[in-house]
Curated annotation (Swiss-Prot):
Region (Linker): 227-247
Keywords from the named record: Acyltransferase, Cell shape, Cell wall biogenesis/degradation, Cytoplasm, Magnesium, Metal-binding, Multifunctional enzyme, Nucleotidyltransferase, Peptidoglycan synthesis, Repeat, Transferase
Obligatory cofactor(s): Mg(2+)
Record region (N-acetyltransferase): 248-446
Protein name (Swiss-Prot/TrEMBL): Bifunctional protein GlmU
Length: 446
């Protein structure tokens, strides 16, 4: 049996943030969500989250995971104290306990699988991840005997100058035999420079302690401040972009772009500089994004062009052109072969196939049919000061420049609306409508 405990109780004071450290985003996911993601394939019987500082925020952010058991650590008195809080929850449990940190987000599932396999085959009391670092500052040092058994781990702040020269470090990721661990947990003390109860002190109390060295030390990098957060963001972005370039996506200037891990691409996609994808995005074959576009939780079909535009929670059809400087807001559906031009805003609207809204227009809460032409400066006036109202325009209709359609309103098919008109009544099919005040012209002599 396998139980997994993720430590997420710390204050994260070096982040200088009101947000709990484990909730800071990294390539679109919180740190702790990333840690949870690498545990799914391990098929644990239990997953426990140790919370403390701003516990409610952390718990609320993880409600989508139905199998989590939250354990409160109050006060936060060290990693050993955190694991002591698990004893009532794991009463009667007979198996392995994998201990992870909520601020170590780059771990791979494969690494944890290898750790578990090594631990079980070695019949160890505890096995933990380790690494040899050229610059081990900040990490506890691992000390072994001639046979390779771990004798002790000393936290850096408690090391002598000579002990600090040791480059073998503890990554803080442990696999314990729970029964053996629970027998020694109450023997831990806080006799150290921090007056905290260290989980590392269990190493010298257990029968057989081993370490398992990781292939890629960056995988165990913890995040304590925003500099380290930025370093991890850069690392993930490089991984993501390299992956998609190997699958047929071109980045003109990769370093200036960012992706979310939930982004998916077809082939022959070109991504120009300063383009960013956030949340869950699906980008079809042959799309050309940017420069300067931001796409969030949206689906773009094939051969979509999006230049200097914001697309948020929208669906864009094949062979559609967006921008430059267009804003497609949530719940919008732009059908194939359409054009949304410069300085156009679309909000919660369906735009039919082949429809063109080329410039300087606002279309909100509307349903437009196919092959419609919306003239420059056309506005759907959807808000009466209290409620939003719908505008419907049927196929093959046209609006002249500077038209205002006052919702609720329905414009029929094959309707032409003259420039400068303000329309507040429904218009039947095949109509020509011009509604504007008569010009009054006077000479200066008058």
């Amino acid at each position: 049996m396998l139980a997994i405990a993720i430590l997420a109780a710390g204050k994260g004071t070096r982040m200088k943030s009101k947000l709990p450290k484990v909730l800071h985003p990294l390539a679109g996911k919180s740190l702790i969500d990333r840690v949870l993601s690498c545990t799914h394939g391990l098929k644990p019987n239990r997953r426990l989250i140790v919370v403390g500082h701003q516990a409610n925020l952390v718990e609320d952010s993880l409600r989508k995971h139905q199998d989590l058991d939250f354990v409160l650590q109050q006060p936060q008195n060290g990693t050993g104290h955190a694991i002591q809080q698990l004893k009532p929850r794991l009463k009667g449990f007979n198996g392995e306990l994998l201990v992870l940190n909520g601020d170590v987000p780059l771990l791979k599932e494969e690494t944890l699988s290898s750790l578990l396999k090594f631990h079980k085959e070695s019949n160890a009391s505890v096995t933990f991840l380790s690494a040899s670092l050229d610059s081990p500052t900040g990490y506890g040092r691992v000390f072994t005997d001639e046979s390779g058994l771990v004798k002790k781990i000393i936290e850096e702040r408690d090391c002598t100058n000579e002990q600090r020269k040791n480059k073998l470090i503890n990554a803080g990721i442990y696999c314990f035999n729970w029964q053996q661990l629970s027998d020694v947990l109450n023997l831990l003390s806080n006799q150290n420079s921090q007056n905290e109860i260290y989980l590392t002190d269990t190493i010298s109390l257990l029968k057989k302690a081993l370490h398992f060295e990781v292939d890629n030390p960056f995988e165990i990098k913890g995040i304590n401040d925003r500099v380290q957060l930025s370093e991890c963001e850069h690392y993930i972005q490089e991984e993501l972009k390299s992956l998609w370039m190997s699958k047929g996506v071109s980045f003109v200037d990769p370093i200036s772009c960012s992706l979310s891990e939930d982004s998916n691409f077809g082939t022959d996609v070109i991504i120009e500089p300063q383009t960013h994808l956030r949340g869950k995005c699906s980008i079809g074959n042959g799309c050309h994004l940017g420069p300067g576009s931001v796409i969030t939780n949206s689906t773009l079909a094939e051969n979509v062009l999006a230049i200097h535009s914001f697309i948020n929670e929208a669906t864009i059809g094949n062979n559609t052109s967006i921008g430059p400087f267009a804003h497609i807001r949530p719940e919008s559906n732009i059908r194939q072969n359409s054009k949304i031009g410069n300085f156009v805003e679309i909000k919660k609207s369906c735009i039919g196939e082949g429809t063109k809204i080329n410039h300087l227009s606002y279309v909100g809460d509307s349903a437009l049919g196919k092959n419609i032409n919306i003239g420059a400066g056309t506005i759907t006036a959807n808000f009466d000061g209290k409620n939003k109202h719908r505008t419907i325009i049927d196929d093959y209709s046209k609006t002249g420049a500077n038209s205002v359609l006052v919702a609720p309103i329905k414009i029929g098919a094959h309707v032409t609306i003259g420039a400068g008109s303000t329309i507040s009544k429904d218009i039947p099919d095949k109509s020509l409508v011009v509604e504007r005040s008569k010009a009054i012209i006077r000479t200066k002599a008058d």
